[in-house]
Amino acid sequence: MIEIRFHGRGGQGAVTAANILAEAAFIEGKYVQAFPFFGVERRGAPVTAFTRIDEKPIRIKTQIYEPDVVVVLDPSLLETVDVTAGLKEDGIVIVNTEKSKEEVLEKLKRKPKKLALVDATTIALETLGLPITNTAILGAVAKATGLVKIESVETAIKDTFSGELGEKNAKAAREAFEKTQIFEV
């Protein structure tokens, strides 16, 4: 079983990202779970969401405390939240940032085996006209993890958002997939 933990802020779409990733894996015939955890429920407050993906039915119902993958939608969280808490030794961290690998690693309390960086904010602004990075970051997740194909992510996005909005969000995911930089740490 692969466990993914998303870190974002209220209004950024972390919960939607967790759900879309689960749908993309479901499209590929995998068993999935996706669920949020809210602390203080207000726009801008830190939000955590979770996705589990497996080849067999998932019976566990707890939060994810030892993720295989951590996805950070808002780079300012690197300053205030230990996003790598419990990260497995061979874990992957995916960050929406324009900063360098060195700058990001300096902020992480635990070093991942693999670090993936993409400027999802710029991609979202250029593609959607809004700094909502949830769909763009899923392109980075597909590239960095290989858990799902980018085509499945695009299909799941279009299933979630109809018409032109779906097309634009799928385009953002594809662009992030192509622009994600991956580093072995």
Curated annotation (Swiss-Prot):
Keywords, comma-separated and alphabetical: Oxidoreductase
The chain's coiled-coil residues are none
Q: Name one GO molecular function term.
A: pyruvate synthase activity
Record EC number = 1.2.7.1, 1.2.7.7
Q: Which reaction does it catalyse?
A: 2 oxidized [2Fe-2S]-[ferredoxin] + pyruvate + CoA = 2 reduced [2Fe-2S]-[ferredoxin] + acetyl-CoA + CO2 + H(+); 3-methyl-2-oxobutanoate + 2 oxidized [2Fe-2S]-[ferredoxin] + CoA = 2-methylpropanoyl-CoA + 2 reduced [2Fe-2S]-[ferredoxin] + CO2 + H(+)
Per its UniProt record, what InterPro entries does this chain match?
Oxidoreductase_gamma_subunit, PorC_KorC, Pyrv/ketoisovalerate_OxRed_cat, Pyrv_flavodox_OxRed_cen
Q: What class of enzyme is it?
A: oxidoreductase
- What assembly does the database describe for this protein? Heterotetramer of one alpha, one beta, one delta and one gamma chain.
Entries under NCBIfam families matching the protein: PorC_KorC (TIGR02175), PRK08534.1 (NF006321), PRK14029.1 (NF010632)
Return the PANTHER family for the record.
PYRUVATE SYNTHASE SUBUNIT PORC
**By what name is this protein known?**
Pyruvate/ketoisovalerate oxidoreductases common subunit gamma
The lineage, from the top, is:
Archaea, Methanobacteriati, Methanobacteriota, Thermococci, Thermococcales
Could you tell me the gene encoding this protein? porG
